[in-house]
């Protein structure tokens, strides 16, 4: 599996930011990953297809996730959005099309709202404009238990979870576990609680930029109906992928994602040199 080149940027007042950057002169896309994941875990199945379509692909690891920034401050979604904005500015890649999955969708919404000069279009998937219904609020309140589990027995917990998701190849499972173990248990738990507090309903319809939503139609974590309500609130074009929430690496997801990106992004130019140097 080939991954795009890694970059570490120093953002004054923030710290070191880790991201993937395929380079090239294509329209920039910033990929924002989901909760507990890293950029590579969420997006490795999509990197090659987006580069082949002519885009410059950027994918940041959020605070407390993967190789992302570690801070003594509590995890805040708004800080993740500010980190992404800083990376785009430092790279001269703003404004970019921003693509957010799950928690990354909440961060993408905040990025477009709080840093509008950095965003030219937005694609959301497997996400919502709030998680306020009783079942969701109960789930997010349980994040202290998750923190304890990931801190006490992380290898055991992740290997069981991956086995249930059908990852049987030992090399792939080892890589996935190694990526998951990079995360900070404290930040993971706090990120979950932050999601429980997130609510963009009062302003999501006022972003005024091209928007698309890829609805994960078999999603057991973020209901498809809630994803459609988000799309309606934004006036976004709807695309569909017949997957559950944790199946973004399945073949059916990437074509829908690429179509959604093409519906809002600037016209692609020549592909990045990375495309011919090792894209999957």
Protein language model annotation of sequence segments:
Residues 98-100, 125:
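Short beta-strand immediately N-terminal to the catalytic nucleophile in serine-hydrolase-like folds
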């Amino acid at each position: 599996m080939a991954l795009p080149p890694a970059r570490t940027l120093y953002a004054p007042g923030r710290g070191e930011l880790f991201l993937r950057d395929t380079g090239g002169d294509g329209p920039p896309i910033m990929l924002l990953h989901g909760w507990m994941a890293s950029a590579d875990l969420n997006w490795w199945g999509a990197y090659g297809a987006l580069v082949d379509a002519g885009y410059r692909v950027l994918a940041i690891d959020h605070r407390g996730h993967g190789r992302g920034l570690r801070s003594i401050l509590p995890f805040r979604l708004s800080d993740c959005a500010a980190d992404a904005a800083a990376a785009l500015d430092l790279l001269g890649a703003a404004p970019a099309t921003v693509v957010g999955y799950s928690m990354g969708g909440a961060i993408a919404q905040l990025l477009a709202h709080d840093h509008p000069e950095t965003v030219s279009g937005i694609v959301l998937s497997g996400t919502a404009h709030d998680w306020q219904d009783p079942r969701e609020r109960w789930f997010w309140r349980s994040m202290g238990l998750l923190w304890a589990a990931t801190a006490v027995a992380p290898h055991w917990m992740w290997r069981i979870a991956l086995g249930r998701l059908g990852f049987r190849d030992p090399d792939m499972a080892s890589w996935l576990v190694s990526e998951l173990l990079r995360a900070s248990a404290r930040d993971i738990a706090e990120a979950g609680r932050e999601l429980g507090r997130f609510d963009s309903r009062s302003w999501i319809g006022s972003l005024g930029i091209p928007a698309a939503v890829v609805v994960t139609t078999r999603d057991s974590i973020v209901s498809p109906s809630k994803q459609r309500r988000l799309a309606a609130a934004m006036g976004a074009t709807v695309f569909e992928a017949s997957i559950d929430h944790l199946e973004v690496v399945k073949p059916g997801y990437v074509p829908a994602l690429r179509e959604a990106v093409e519906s809002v992004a600037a016209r692609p130019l020549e592909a990045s040199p990375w495309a011919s140097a090792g894209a999957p």
